[in-house]
Amino acid sequence: MRAAAVKFRTCRSTTRVPRIMTARMSDDPLALFDSWFAEARASEPNDSNAMALATATPDGRPSLRMVLLKGHGPDGFVFYTNLDSRKGGELAANPHVALLFHWKSLRRQIRIEGSVAPVDNATADAYFATRSRDSQIGAWASDQSRPLDSRATFEARFAEMQARFAGQDVPRPPRWSGWRVTPERIEFWQDRAHRLHERTLFERTAIGWTKGYLYP
């Protein structure tokens, strides 16, 4: 039986957002990120801090997944994960990564390329302490990216960890920590009519950031 044809033209909304004058955009990409991120937090219905994280093995085989931004500033963009997961292994073996934020409500994207380094233990401990207790226990229960025979096994392991830490604070697992992405390239993309999109590229140099524009 033939699959129904998808009319992809109908998937695209014709709604437009107010025009941004690229000439008026900040020359500081981190300040511009702050501005766009603030708008996304106000307009996105779910997970405005969600970002795609692309990693690769040393021989160039890529993998991609969504993670949550948990900190950002002049020193980079921070996320947390299980260090023994697939992405944890790839990050340890190949520090070159890419991030992508896509905010549908604003019809904007931000692409970031750079390299990662682990956060220090104090930073990881401080963030872990802000997580809900069940999320903390979940970090102990999950052997992320390892084969799992059934959901029941996972739930039993979670219950086991609940019992283990009953009546006490849950410490951060040694295999769970954070990574900081130091950006080298940041591209801001804004949707425009007739696919005449605006692309503004910042590249880091030894003395700061350069700013330029790209054809869409």
Swiss-Prot record:
Binding site for substrate: 70, 127, 131, 135, 195-197
EC number(s) recorded for this UniProt protein: 1.4.3.5
Cofactor entry: FMN
Gene Ontology BP terms: pyridoxine biosynthetic process
Assembly information from the UniProt record: Homodimer.
Family: Belongs to the pyridoxamine 5'-phosphate oxidase family.
Record's protein name: Pyridoxine/pyridoxamine 5'-phosphate oxidase
Organism: Sphingopyxis alaskensis (strain DSM 13593 / LMG 18877 / RB2256) (Sphingomonas alaskensis)
